[in-house]
Amino acid sequence: MALGSRGTVFVGSRVAGKVYAVIDRGDRREVKTIASGLQQPNGIAFRDGALYVGETHRVIRFDQIESRLDAAPVPVVVYSDLPAQTHHHWRYMAFGPDGALYIAIGAPCNICTLAAEYAQIRRVDLATGRHEVVARGVRNSIGFDWHPLTRELWFTDNGRDWGEADRVPDELNRVAAPGQHFGFPYCHGGDFPDPEFSAGRSCAEFVAPTLKLGPNVAALGMRFYTGSLFPAEYRGNLFIAQRGSWNRELKTGFAVMRVTLKGNVVERYEPFVTGWMNEERFWGRPVDVLVMPDGALLISDDHAGAIFRVSVAR
């Protein structure tokens, strides 16, 4: 999800290959389809009146989109230097405080030896087309945001499946310096060398996660809370959408979690919104979160096909 300057909420639907605009009309909300037939349009970002959509093979731009919701313009290709892949081939992306576009490129496998262009987060200068790698060893990130005070990049990452997956957590990570390596495929969770792919590497060579989120919770979208609607103690907290496990007998995730920080240290990690699962049955999967101008928190759910709004009763 991404927010337009006029309050339009843009939503990418990866499986449907569509991008939607949700418009608040006061007494009702209207949904318009502004693009279809796209390849995995998971990444959505808005800047200077334009909507940017990340497909598997390219990033496209829809200019002046909020004035043209009834007839979206023909998109312009702004970046296409992306590797071909069919595994983890969605491109989460967002504009950073420096004005550059950051794009996550997952590993082309559950776990494998990697070519240099995979398992990373890139910083792209759209004016020149040049990019630099700001984080390596990132298996499958589908959510990141910048700390509102330090401007450091924080991101979620999904750990490997199968094998000893119960020992491999999803992670919350912080990029303290460009080019840091976060372990994949050699080390998981900061302290578990991969039995097959560690290649004699020590976990001490890599950046350990700031927080282990739990195995197979499918930690996806995340945002720092910068609104003023929630009580003051929520400002600067992190909200993380956990879509939930898919290959475990004992299911995990299916919640939006709250992370309370003191500096860069986690003080609390606790459920914020639950109720998508009961007794091993689930009826929803939270995917992304978005802080609205009024301070409310939106939560997208790709199983129920819904967007929920969390606010505070006055």
Write out the residue ranges for each language-model feature.
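Blade-loop segments of beta-propeller domains
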Residues: 14, 18-50
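Hydrophobic beta-strand segments that make up the repeating blades of beta-propeller
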Residues: 1, 8-11, 50-53, 101-103, ...
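Conserved beta-strand position repeated across blades of beta-propeller domains
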Residues: 1-2, 45, 94, 145, ...
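Beta-propeller domain segments
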Residues: 6, 90, 107-111, 119, ...
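Predominantly a core beta-strand signature of beta-propeller blades
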Residues: 28-32, 68, 73-79, 118, ...
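Surface loop/turn motifs at the tips and blade-to-blade linkers of beta-strand repeat domains
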Residues: 32-37, 78-85, 133-138, 212-214, ...
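Asp-box/WD-like beta-propeller blade repeats and closely related beta-sheet repeat scaffolds
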Residues: 40, 45, 57-96, 104-107, ...
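A detector of repeated loop/turn-to-beta-strand junctions in beta-rich toroidal repeat architectures
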Residues: 16, 56, 72, 115-118, ...
